[in-house]
């Protein structure tokens, strides 16, 4: 027994000696005064692997600073003395030595905490938490730092000196359960959180890495970022996700350093980690520093994290970033931007800091109680609203700036309707894309070098898109060298308003399958601008004109239209201006069936044009024949010219329609096969109606509904020329109005198109009709028209032996007694001598007077 006791005592003494020696060596190595950076020796000492911090937040050497490694009991607060500080947390505690922690730490007191310059409080392990809860002030000196997977700090004031930092970059713990922030597979894609991680896979499908999560808590974010994906089975993960930082400051937070929760870098062997979470509550946020939850760089960049600042005032000099990480494998496709939420103003900003990306940041359901104030998408951020039947509503602005894009719906399922409600919708150098129908309700729409693109797919189920702009809508080309501002839809599109609609820049346009502009007091189409419906392709035009080309019928909704203004598939027009006080056209209005209804005045300036030329029927009632190698022209107001080729004749299309009240489209011609192509007749322009005539039309520019000419030379298999197609017939211009002024050499035409080589016949002319609504005869005669320009209803020319198309018609409403002609001019002799008994034309009256 005695031998056994001696053996135990000997081993106990030996063990104690070994332990004391080990501790002595450790203390010497940690306090030797040699230069010691944040990561030197710590990986082995704490059993930690992976980068401690991101590249942008390297910890500086803590030379000449005492360091120690500490472990404290869980759920118990530590004292100032435990951290080898001077003072107390209930008065003022000064920390003068760096501490490496192996576990969570909790600091509590009613006093102040000051971490002196070059001193750090470090727990560089995934998910480790440092909590500071003091009633007084906290100050970080120059180059001082707090580093941990989670940092929670509560104080009356927090001052961060120059180059100091609170950092949880690349130290995130596990993200919430049932989330897909870490990508699946070995593609080296980035992790997701506030924004999706980037994927560098190249195929025809839309790809991304890790997905977003924690959307519902973006105003109070408290989730870790996610790891990036690896590129092999040996390395399954890339960079770590960012950690969490929560700062609860009763008064002022001064940041002259940085607060970061960035994703870790994955290098070329893995994707970048996604950014973590930063939450700040303070009355005043000041300084010149950085607050960042950016994604990490990797083969595919990590998505940005989430930042929420609940502060009464925020100094603009602060740099707040949640951009995605750079992608080494696909430099043009970084990670998607995260979210920055201003909880005091209730505004959301998604900015990618001009880092280019093809990866989207999904925004899910929006708050309805309370409503957010503003949403900003900017600096190359791409935002996706993926949920069907989504409503995005804010109290203030929705702004998309500087290369930003806002996408509603999914391209494979353009079946839903999306709503956007705000005071203002502001776009500058940006894009809004909609897959489905789009309903907008704003007071002001301003677009600079931007576009709204609406894709309703090929389904007729999608309803019309409606943009209600109550006060002001302006499309402007701000920089001539950049793109133009365009609103386009391949389905029905309506713009309603109570104020002003302006297209001011060269190339600015509003285009749709059908387009209705209504209720504005003024619509201005500036020089080089365009209003167009239908679109340029034949299918779009055919869907609008088909019901008027197959049978000869007059669209009653153009002659006696409904009082209200709406757009649907049952109405005949393709482009409607409805209940607009004044229309000024310096650019181009272009459509198959243009209807200007319940307007007061229309002014077409010198460079302006309203045209339905070459937008009528491909075939039609007066279709030109192609027979025996020769093509006859199409007919309408006049018969189409016959085509001749090698002595063989092809009769032109027949005349049709009513000269007194014309309401038909011009007809076209088609060849024997697709190689010939086709020729299209003129469309139709209707201004006013029987019940609501136009007050005045001032035409300084041009008003056209001409047929298309055929200029293509057709060759046979041996290279010899064959007969060409005839020209299309002119369309219709029908004007219900009180006064017409054709000034400064304007041009009003419904001419037929020319026949093509060889021997094509010309198209017949169209029809022009003036339906005068009120002719002043009470006290003195007031002319209804001032004509100094040109009206042309001629048929198109035939090629070679091809015949010209016949002339169309120009008619006016029957005049009162004493007036004659198309423009109801005064017949003076008739008026004074025979107005009570006769209403003949002047020549007849003059002849009767001479005989008498």
Segments from the language model and where they lie:
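Extracellular, surface-exposed repeat/solenoid domains
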Residues: 302-324, 737, 766-786, 790-792
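N-linked glycosylation sites
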Residues: 37, 75, 89-90, 96, ...
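Low-complexity basic/metal-binding stretches
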Residues: 6-7, 11-12, 827-830, 835-848
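Beta-strand repeat architectures
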Residues: 82-148, 345-347, 352, 360-414, ...
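Glycine-centric low-complexity/flexibility signal
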Residues: 47, 52-56, 60-64, 68-78, ...
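N-terminal signal peptide
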Residues: 19-58
